[in-house]
């Protein structure tokens, strides 16, 4: 069976995945001082951080649209999986679920599953690795979902921040203050 893994741009794609059509990143949009910056392969983190430091307003982010997820899901793969930034931090999960529903209205038998990573960044990448491992081992669609959901339940992600300024000014996550 063929498969595809879609991951929002908060997750990290391995170099080998960037060349593999079974993996696709969908970009979040970051806004600083009225400027929209797409978090894609052209994203310049140093420039973005300078803009954040120079801007008195809190930066904002926007998740990929349901239509963008729908386009990513619309492929020939038998099994399609999405790994999103934690639903507690972003609307990316809800957007992916809506994109799945939109595509399944047109293709009712399409097997798509959206994982709420309950994590970010490398945590999402580790989940994508687990999906790949399960698919390469020949697991059924249902067994991949069961195995990966158990993996997510046992996963713990810790973050180290240079400073807490963005956490204090950002409206999410809500319970960080």
PLM region spans:
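Short coil/turn connectors at secondary-structure junctions
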Residues: 1-3, 21, 77-79, 108-111, ...
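N-terminal glycine-rich anion-binding loop in soluble enzyme alpha/beta folds
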Residues: 4-65
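General beta-strand structural signal in soluble alpha/beta enzymes
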Residues: 5-7, 61-62, 81-82, 113-116, ...
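Glycine-rich phosphate- or other oxyanion-binding loops that anchor nucleotides, phosphorylated ligands
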Residues: 53-98, 145, 153
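Active-site histidine-anchored catalytic micro-motif
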Residues: 85, 91-157
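Long, charge-dense, solvent-exposed interaction surfaces that engage phosphate-rich ligands
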Residues: 161, 167
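Single conserved hydrophobic/aromatic residue that forms the stacking wall/gate
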Residues: 168-177
